[in-house]
Amino acid sequence: MHVIEVLGPGCANCQRLEANTRSAVDMTGAQAQIVKVTDYAKISSYGIMSTPGLVIDGEVVSFGRVPSSTDIAEWLRQMDLAAAQAG
C-alpha cells in the first residue's frame, strides 16, 4: 500500500492536487492512503520551498505545481514496477 502525502495549507492548488491524486489512485486501482499535511514543520522537513507538494512513499515527486492525474498515475505505476522488480 502506498502512503501519499499532499503537502500544503489547503489552498486552491492544494485541493486540486488532492483531487488529481484521488483520480490517479482510482485510475490505477492502487492501494493507497492519502494524507493531507498542513503542518509547516512537517512540510519543510521534506525540503519543499513552495506548495503544493506531493510525496509518495516518503519520496518527494512534485512541488510548486499541480501535476495532472495522468502524471501521478504514471509515478504510481513506475513505483509499483520498481517494487515488483526489486522483489
Regions found by a protein language model. Give the residues of each.
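Local sequence-structure signature of Cys/Sec-based thiol-disulfide redox active-site neighborhoods
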Residues: 1-25
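Non-catalytic, surface beta->alpha helical segment in thiol-disulfide oxidoreductase systems
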Residues: 56-83
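Glycine-rich phosphate-binding loops of nucleotide-dependent enzymes
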Residues: 85-87
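Structural micro-motif
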Residues: 47-55
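Thiol-based oxidoreductase modules, predominantly thioredoxin-like and allied folds used
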Residues: 30-42
